[in-house]
C-alpha cells in the first residue's frame, strides 16, 4: 500500500466505527502557548480532554501534520542520519472524549492492523507492551484479543520516579494522566535488536508503530491518582513508520512518499540519487518548510520564524555540500505538492508563495554561506582538540547567519563537537548589551490588581452614568484622588473603549458634581477597564456616582480608521495572496498602521490596486454588520481570527461588503463603509524579516493629505515656471538642461585636471628610484581624482600617487601605483592605511584604489603616510 492509501484507509476505518473525521489543525498551536509547534494528534483536542471544550462529537479521527524542531521536542540534529527521525511527520490518531475506553480502543487497533480488509499484518509479528500494573489492558490483550503471553511485555516505572514510565503518559506534574499500551512490529531475526524492555530494545528489529493512551486518572499536587469521571482515549500511529512496515523497508526514507522527494531533490541539486545523508536532509526539510510556510510562518530571527530559518539554511548547506549551484531548494516544492497536495490542499493553494519565500531565503543565505564556510574551515584547521569554541560558533551565527545547529552539523561530520555552553554565554552577553541599550517604562497595568468586571456600554453610546468601584495612584489602591493628582479610575460600567486589537483606548472625562477627571487613555486588565488620567478639579472618592463622557469626535475618527484596516486586510489578501496575515496594528484618530506577513516590498502598481479595491468598497456604502455567535460557527462563516488572541465561547463577528471582509473583532467601527470617505496609503516598508507595514489615512485626514500634495505640486510648478498641467514636461526640460551642464562641467574639470597634472608632476619626490606624489586638491570629486591619477601615472612613469580632497564635507582619496611596482607595492594597501587615518574605509586593485572618510582635519596626516609606505615596501 502507498502512504496515501494507508492514510485514507485509517480515516475510513474509524469513520466506519462512528468517528468524525477531523481535519489536521495548523502547525501553529491555537490553544496552547507552551507549544512551539503542533507535535501530536491530541494537541488540537487538548481542551476536550481537559473538559474545557464540548464538541458535537465524542469520537474523532485525524491525520495530523506535526513538526519536531526546536524547543523540547527537537529531532533536527538527527534528521538524515537515522532511519526514523524527521522534522515533519504525520500522526494518525483516533480519540474518545468520555466515550469508549480500553476494550474498544484495543480491539479497534488490532482489527485495523490485522484484518484482511485493512492492513493485514501477520499477527505473529506484533508485540504489545502495557503498564506494569494495568491488569485490565493486559487481560484484554491476552484473554479477548488472543495475544500470547510471550509477546506481551509489562513495563514499570523505568525513569526514576513513580509513574515515570514509557508506558505511563502524563500531561504535566498534575492533571490528566494514565497508562498506555504500545504495539510493536518485529522485523525479524536478521535485524539486530531485542524486544521492548530488554537491554537491546534500541535496536531496529522491534519498532513501535502505535501507542494507545488511556487517560483515566487526575494526578493532584500530592502525587495521588484520582479516577476521572469520564476516561478518554488518545492514540497515535506515525504514517511514515507504518508505511515502512507495509512496504517491507527498514528506513522511512525508503517509503514511496520519500522516494519521490529524494528523486526531486537530486534533480534540483544536480547530483545522483544515492541515499546520501545530505540528500535525506533536503528531502525531509522540504516537508517541514513547505507546511510551515503554508501555515503562515515566515523566516525570521525569533520564535517559530527562526526555527524555519534554521531548517531552510540546514537544507541549503547540505545541498551546497552535494554540489548545488545557486538556489535549488524552492524547486522541490512542486514534487511536495504532487505527493501531498491532495491530502493537504493548503500546499496547492500556497505553492507559489512557498516557492517565493524559499527562493528569497536561499538567495539571502547564499550571500554569506560561502564566506562563512571558509571562515569555519580556517578555524577548524587551527583547532586544537575536538571541541569548536563557543566564540567561533557565535561569530558564525552573528556575522554569517549560521544557526548553532548548522555549525554543529558540520562539526559532527569531522567527529567534532561544539561548546554549546560557551555559545550560550556569548548569546547572553549580546542580550545584556541589547538590554543596556534599551529603556523601559513602568507597566502600570501590571501594578493595578483589581477583581472587578466592568460592563462595557460603548458600542452604541459615548456617555452614561456609572459608579467608581476603585481608585489607584502610583499603582496603589487609594480611597480618594485629589485635585492635580494623576491616577486610575475603575467603574462598574463604562462607554470608554479599552485599548485592544490595535485600537487605542478612548479619551474624554468623568464628571462627579464639581469634580472632573480627565481621561487620557483607557486600558484593560482582566475584566476591569482602567481610566488613566488626572483629576482636573475637586476630589473623587470610591463609591462616587459619575457621568461618563467619551470624546465623540476622536472616537468617530478612530472607528473609521479601524474599519478601514479590515478593508485593507481583505484587499491585501486579494492582491498579494492568502498567506497575508495580520501581525499587528495601531489605529487612532489620525491614521492607521497595519503590519502583515509578506516577504518582499510591495510594488507601486500593487499599492494602487490596494487603494482601488478599498475605495471601491467604501463607495459601495455597504452596512458594517456585527453578530454575536460561537467560535465554531464564526469559523464556518470564514471569519478571520487574529493569531495569538484568546477568544471566548462567544465571539463578535464583523462583516463589511457581504463576505468581502469577515473578521472576529471587538472594536468600535463605522456604521457604513461610506462613512470612511476615502483611504490613501502614505507609506509602505519592512519592519522585520517577513513583516511589512502600511500606514494610511482616511476621511478628513486623507483629504488634508491630498490637499497638501496638491500645494506641493503647485509650488514645484511655480519653481520651474510652469503649471500643474505641464509640470512633467517642465521638470524633464530642467533635468535635461542640468545633465548638459554637468557634462560641460566634467569636460572643464578634465581640462583643469590635465593642466594641474602638468604642474603636479613637478612636485613628485624621488624615493629609492620611485616618483612619489601625495597632494591635497580640495573641491575635486572622486571621478576627477581618478582621471588625474591615471594622467600622472603616465607622466611620471615608475610612480606611487595618493591624491586627497575634501568634497561636500567628506574626505575623498584615490591611490595609484604603476604596474611595474605592483609586485612590491599595492594601491589597495596604501588606501587602507590612508582611509583609516581619516576615519573611513577603502580598497581596490593593486594598481588603483579608492576610499574616503569623515575626518577632514586628518587628511594632511593621511597623505604624509605615502613616503613611509614606499620606503618600507621597497
Swiss-Prot record:
The keyword RNA-binding applies. GO terms for cellular component: cytosol. It is found in: Cytoplasm. SMART domains: tRNA_SAD (SM00863). Binds 1 zinc ion per subunit. One of its GO terms (biological process) is negative regulation of DNA-templated transcription. GO terms for molecular function: alanine-tRNA ligase activity; aminoacyl-tRNA deacylase activity; ATP binding; tRNA binding; zinc ion binding. It catalyses: tRNA(Ala) + L-alanine + ATP = L-alanyl-tRNA(Ala) + AMP + diphosphate. It comes from the Bacteria. InterPro entries: aa-tRNA-synth_II/BPL/LPL (IPR045864), Ala-tRNA-lgiase_IIc (IPR002318), Ala-tRNA-ligase_IIc_anticod-bd (IPR018162), Ala-tRNA-synth_IIc_core (IPR018165), Ala-tRNA-synth_IIc_N (IPR018164), Ala-tRNA_ligase (IPR050058), Ala_tRNA_ligase_euk/bac (IPR023033), DHHA1_dom (IPR003156). Keywords: Aminoacyl-tRNA synthetase, ATP-binding, Cytoplasm, Ligase, Metal-binding, Nucleotide-binding, Protein biosynthesis, RNA-binding, tRNA-binding, Zinc. Zn(2+) binds at residues 562, 566, 665, 669. Its cofactor is Zn(2+). The keyword Transcription does not apply. Signal peptide: none annotated. PROSITE patterns: AA_TRNA_LIGASE_II_ALA. Its EC number is 6.1.1.7. NCBIfam families: alaS (TIGR00344). PANTHER family: ALANINE--TRNA LIGASE, CYTOPLASMIC (PTHR11777:SF9), ALANYL-TRNA SYNTHETASE (PTHR11777). Belongs to the class-II aminoacyl-tRNA synthetase family. Catalyzes the attachment of alanine to tRNA(Ala) in a two-step reaction: alanine is first activated by ATP to form Ala-AMP and then transferred to the acceptor end of tRNA(Ala). Also edits incorrectly charged Ser-tRNA(Ala) and Gly-tRNA(Ala) via its editing domain. Consists of three domains; the N-terminal catalytic domain, the editing domain and the C-terminal C-Ala domain. The editing domain removes incorrectly charged amino acids, while the C-Ala domain, along with tRNA(Ala), serves as a bridge to cooperatively bring together the editing and aminoacylation centers thus stimulating deacylation of misacylated tRNAs. HAMAP family: Ala_tRNA_synth_B (MF_00036_B). This is Alanine--tRNA ligase. The lineage of its organism: Bacteria, Pseudomonadati, Pseudomonadota, Gammaproteobacteria, Pseudomonadales. The gene is alaS.
Amino acid at each position: 500500500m502507498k502512504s496515501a492509501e494507508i492514510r485514507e484507509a485509517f480515516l475510513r476505518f474509524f469513520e466506519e466505527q462512528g468517528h468524525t473525521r477531523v481535519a489536521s489543525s495548523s502547525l501553529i498551536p491555537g490553544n496552547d502557548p507552551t507549544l512551539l509547534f503542533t507535535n501530536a494528534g491530541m494537541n488540537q483536542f487538548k481542551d476536550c480532554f481537559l473538559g474545557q471544550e464540548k464538541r458535537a462529537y465524542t469520537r474523532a479521527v485525524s491525520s495530523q501534520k506535526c513538526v519536531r524542531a526546536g524547543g523540547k521536542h527537537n529531532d533536527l540534529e538527527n534528521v538524515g542520519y537515522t532511519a526514523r527521525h524527521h522534522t515533519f511527520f504525520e500522526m494518525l490518531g483516533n480519540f474518545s472524549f468520555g466515550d469508549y475506553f480500553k476494550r474498544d480502543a484495543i480491539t479497534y487497533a488490532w482489527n485495523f492492523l490485522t484484518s484482511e480488509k485493512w492492513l493485514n499484518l501477520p499477527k505473529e509479528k506484533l508485540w504489545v507492551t502495557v503498564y506494569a500494573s494495568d491488569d485490565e489492558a493486559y487481560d484484554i490483550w491476552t484473554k479477548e484479543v488472543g495475544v500470547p503471553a510471550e509477546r506481551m511485555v509489562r513495563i514499570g516505572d523505568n525513569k526514576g520516579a513513580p509513574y515515570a514510565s514509557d508506558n505511563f503518559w502524563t500531561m504535566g506534574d498534575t492533571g490528566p494522566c494514565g497508562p498506555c499500551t504500545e504495539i510493536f512490529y518485529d522485523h525479524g531475526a536478521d535485524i539486530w535488536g531485542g524486544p521492548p524492555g530488554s537491554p537491546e530494545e534500541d535496536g531496529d528489529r522491534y519498532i513501535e508503530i502505535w501507542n494507545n493512551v488511556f487517560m483515566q486518572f487526575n494526578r493532584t499536587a500530592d502525587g495521588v491518582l484520582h479516577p476521572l469521571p469520564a476516561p478518554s482515549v488518545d492514540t497515535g500511529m506515525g504514517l511514515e513508520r507504518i508505511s515502512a512496515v507495509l512496504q517491507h523497508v527498514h528506513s522511512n526514507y525508503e517509503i514511496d512518499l520519500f522516494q519521490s522527494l529524494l528523486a526531486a531533490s537530486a534533480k534540483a541539486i544536480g547530483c545522483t540519487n544515492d541515499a546520501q545523508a545530505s540528500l535525506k536532509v533536503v528531502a525531509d526539510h522540504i516537508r517541514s518548510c513547505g507546511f510551515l510556510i503554508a501555515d503562515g510562518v515566515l523566516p525570521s530571527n525569533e520564535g517559530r520564524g527562526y526555527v524555519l530559518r534554521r531548517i531552510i539554511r540546514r537544507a541549503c548547506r547540505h545541498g551546497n555540500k552535494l554540489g548545488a549551484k545557486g538556489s535549488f531548494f524552492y524547486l522541490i516544492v512542486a514534487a511536495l505538492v504532487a505527493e501531498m497536495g491532495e491530502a493537504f490542499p493548503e500546499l496547492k493553494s500556497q505553492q507559489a508563495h512557498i516557492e517565493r519565500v524559499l527562493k528569497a531565503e536561499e538567495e539571502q543565505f547564499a550571500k554569506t554561506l560561502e564566506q562563512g564556510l571558509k571562515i569555519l574551515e580556517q578555524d577548524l584547521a587551527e583547532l586544537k582538540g575536538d571541541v569548536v569554541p563557543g566564540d567561533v560558533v557565535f561569530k558564525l551565527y552573528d556575522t554569517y547567519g549560521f544557526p548553532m545547529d548548522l555549525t554543529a552539523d558540520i562539526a559532527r561530520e569531522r567527529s567534532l563537537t561544539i561548546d554549546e555552553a560557551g555559545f550560550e554565554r556569548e548569546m547572553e552577553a549580546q542580550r545584556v548589551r541589547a538590554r543596556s541599550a534599551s529603556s523601559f517604562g513602568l507597566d502600570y497595568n501590571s501594578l493595578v490588581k483589581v477583581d472587578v468586571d466592568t460592563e462595557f456600554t460603548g458600542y452604541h453610546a459615548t456617555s452614561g452614568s456609572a459608579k467608581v468601584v476603585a481608585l489607584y495612584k502610583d499603582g496603589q489602591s487609594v480611597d480618594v484622588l485629589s485635585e492635580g493628582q494623576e491616577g486610575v479610575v475603575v467603574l462598574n460600567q463604562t462607554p470608554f473603549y479599552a485599548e485592544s486589537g490595535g485600537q487605542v483606548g478612548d479619551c474624554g472625562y468623568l464628571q462627579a458634581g464639581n469634580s472632573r477627571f480627565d481621561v487620557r487613555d483607557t486600558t484593560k486588565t482582566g475584566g476591569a477597564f482602567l481610566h488613566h488620567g488626572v483629576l482636573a478639579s475637586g476630589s473623587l472618592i470610591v463609591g462616587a456616582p459619575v457621568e461618563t463622557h467619551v470624546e465623540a469626535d476622536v472616537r468617530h475618527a478612530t472607528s473609521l480608521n479601524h474599519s478601514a484596516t479590515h478593508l485593507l486586510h481583505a484587499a491585501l489578501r486579494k492582491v498579494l495572496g492568502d498567506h497575508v496575515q495580520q501581525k499587528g496594528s495601531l489605529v487612532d484618530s489620525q491614521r492607521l498602521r497595519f503590519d502583515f506577513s509578506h516577504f518582499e516590498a510591495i510594488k507601486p502598481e500593487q499599492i494602487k490596486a490596494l487603494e482601488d479595491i478599498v475605495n471601491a468598497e467604501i463607495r459601495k456604502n455597504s452596512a458594517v454588520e456585527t453578530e454575536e455567535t460561537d467560535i465554531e460557527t464564526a469559523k464556518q462563516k470564514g471569519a478571520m481570527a487574529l493569531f495569538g488572541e484568546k477568544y471566548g465561547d462567544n465571539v463578535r463577528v464583523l462583516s463589511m461588503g457581504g463576505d468581502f471582509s469577515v473578521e472576529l473583532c471587538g472594536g468600535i467601527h463605522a456604521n457604513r463603509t461610506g462613512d470612511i470617505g476615502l483611504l490613501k496609503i502614505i507609506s509602505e516598508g519592512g519592519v522585520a524579516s517577513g513583516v511589512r507595514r502600511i500606514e494610511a489615512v482616511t476621511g478628513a485626514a486623507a483629504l488634508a493629505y491630498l490637499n497638501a500634495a496638491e500645494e506641493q505640486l503647485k509650488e514645484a510648478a511655480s519653481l520651474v515656471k510652469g503649471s500643474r498641467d505641464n509640470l512633467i514636461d517642465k521638470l524633464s526640460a530642467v533635468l535635461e538642461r542640468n545633465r548638459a551642464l554637468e557634462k560641460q562641467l566634467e569636460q572643464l574639470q578634465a581640462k583643469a585636471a590635465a593642466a594641474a597634472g602638468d604642474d603636479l608632476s613637478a612636485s613628485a619626490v624621488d624615493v629609492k628610484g620611485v616618483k612619489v606624489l601625495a597632494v591635497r586638491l580640495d573641491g575635486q570629486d572622486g571621478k576627477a581624482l581618478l582621471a588625474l591619477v591615471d594622467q600622472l601615472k603616465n607622466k611620471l612613469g615608475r610612480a606611487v600617487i595618493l591624491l586627497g580632497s575634501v568634497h561636500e564635507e567628506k574626505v575623498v582619496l584615490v591611490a595609484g601605483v604603476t604596474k611595474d611596482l605592483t609586485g612590491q607595492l599595492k594601491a589597495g594597501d596604501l588606501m587602507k592605511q590612508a582611509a583609516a587615518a581619516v576615519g573611513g574605509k577603502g580598497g581596490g586593485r593593486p594598481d588603483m584604489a579608492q576610499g574616503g572618510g569623515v575626518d577632514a582635519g586628518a587628511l594632511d596626516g593621511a597623505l604624509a603616510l605615502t613616503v613611509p609606505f614606499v620606503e618600507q615596501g621597497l
